């Protein structure tokens, strides 16, 4: 944490403290060597506590003050108040646990240790002052440097230069907040090099009660109730730790939790990595496989693939406080940089092909182009990164670990060699899995082999060519077997990143200023610049902070199925959605009760439930009420505002609306009405046209409603045709069958059609029946009797006609009742939808906000993006950007 500097006579901020007077008589005082003095001068300049920083507190692991120095300063501010202070408060103590008693002791009997002074620090006897400096305090995390100040006075002149080099490297090697074990190893190393420091006294090392946190004391004294370690010299410190190497206290940090871990030499020239896009090779191949499942012979399918490519990759993968992800298992976890012109140029070619008319590029041609994109890692291995490669190429050091530079460089070379030999195999596997051997693409060009450069030339004979071939074949076979087994092991553990916004971004920064410290606001607020058009919604990074939009979704928490639902919504395939919605609703119900950011899940569940009802109504009746369509559009607009992308070529609501308007079944019902109204040859002509249309539509993909219309229409027309062509003696059953089918047809499809041909046959049959009954009367009857019989026959005929008309009227009343109920549904459903949306909004504003807050947003630096694609799409994530290319509007 902090420590002291020169004992006396410090004035005007002078840094000549090593030459000032120290303890003891001037004739017997110790004097620091000149070389060591200049080294301490440089160390103090680099690691001193800022003048405006709070030097009276110690920060805890949570970054908040955990202790206050000068415990007696508040109790004894004046002589009178000191006399009036209660004696029970003058003893500072805390219970000492068994684990702490191994290394520490209770010092409540020595109250002067907890008093601040301007003279000295103390060692473990609690009485002997320690030679140290009191004019300066070290920064948080570097209080351990106080241990080496007394050692500086014991160094012999012949070891002065070596000890100076040791001091110069000490802060860089240990860094901030080393563990007690690291400090112990450093002391062992110092004693081996400089045995004269063995009996040098050291300041008290104090431990915080109940917490693995240590502090090397200085003139400010010990924090209240902290325990001193049982060591007062270098020898006693080494002996104490050596006898207790199994203690968990050795894992405690020396210092406090100040700035935290970060890249030590990160500057504004590295800020473009924050907004650059990366994607793992596994996620790239998985996204391209999803694109190959889309029907590329349709306009909607091409738009969906274009939008999927727009949203590849993640940003905010690395920044000053966030280390580049570690390289875990297999070359599939390597990150490919998407924000570069070489990748962008290849994607521009695919974009142009997707935007061409359907006649210019067939679906097979587009599939070949998409498969060829899978070879990006093998064609550009120089932009594939692991942690070692990234830190080595950018000369970045994490948390002052300068001693790891050599190992990082060596491991980066090893990673490069592994990538150069494995990327081609990954591409070959991707091609075989995605095309089933149907497509042949260009082999990736040979990758430059990187060789380790030795300090001295290494002479080696030329190996045999046959030996090289044999080794290559054996290695390839073994590698293929191991890789296949490894893929089988990882297949069940595949975890996908949530895809990002507009792709790709290529940024440069010519600024060399240091980045603002954590917690400070940026020098200028993010906004629009003259040469950059920001997307309508902010580009999502990997830090989720909101509670009510797609940014809050943690895919590790939600699971891959939720991401698949988002992808299905983006693709707009109604059949796939209908099958996935029931299971997705059950998953969303679980997420609403257990996951963070559940407000977004609630709104998605409401949308999926409404969409499921609409899809069911569309498939069964080829109809969707205007209220349902309006509800879907309202929810889609709200979800789009919260980060869920919808395809401009057709959201699910638009697809349903278009499907209703272009319904094959409804078109056939209208054609059937036209045929039923005709008679004679006109009926036969229209019936033939209707049957021809039915034969053509059978070859297409039809809904269940369309299938029912085709079957019923075919059966009805066949029955009418049979009734028209049958002999009059056999007319009655066929006519009854045709009329019954017509009534069923009207009931199924909510129509009130009547067949002119069937009505004509019915009237003809009634008249023939009446004439037959009239002709059967006895010839001896009088004319009056004949007239009465004719009158009765006519009355019976009129009653039959009225009965037939009553049947038609009952069908019309049923249709009227159905229309009235639909009207009531259209009126009530918008009210229910508005109420549901209001409840969801109340939940988003209320309950979801009561969760624990997320990490504060960090504004990404401004940059000039290079975009291969732009345009608002419906794919894996959120935003639309405006750039050089735009999708033409129709």
UniProtKB/Swiss-Prot annotation:
Catalysed reactions, semicolon-separated: Hydrolyzes a Gly-|-Gly bond at its own C-terminus, commonly in the sequence -Tyr-Xaa-Val-Gly-|-Gly, in the processing of the potyviral polyprotein
Keyword Metal-binding belongs to the record: no
Region (Disordered): 508-533
Signal peptide: none
Record-annotated Peptidase C6 domain positions: 135-255
Keyword entries, A-Z: Hydrolase, Protease, Thiol protease
Statement: the UniProt record of this protein carries the keyword Hydrolase: yes
Site (Cleavage): 255-256
Active site positions: 143 (for helper component proteinase activity), 215 (for helper component proteinase activity)
Family annotation (Pfam families): Peptidase_C6 (PF00851), TMV_coat (PF00721)
Transmembrane intervals: none
EC numbers on record: 3.4.22.45
Composition skew (Pro residues), residue ranges: 515-528
GO molecular function: cysteine-type endopeptidase activity; structural molecule activity
Record GO biological process: proteolysis
PTM comment text: The viral RNA2 of bymoviruses is expressed as a single polyprotein which undergoes post-translational proteolytic processing resulting in the production of at least two individual proteins. The HC-pro cleaves its C-terminus autocatalytically (Potential).
SUPFAM superfamilies tied to this protein: TMV-like viral coat proteins
Family (UniProt): Belongs to the bymoviruses polyprotein 2 family.
Entry protein name: Genome polyprotein 2
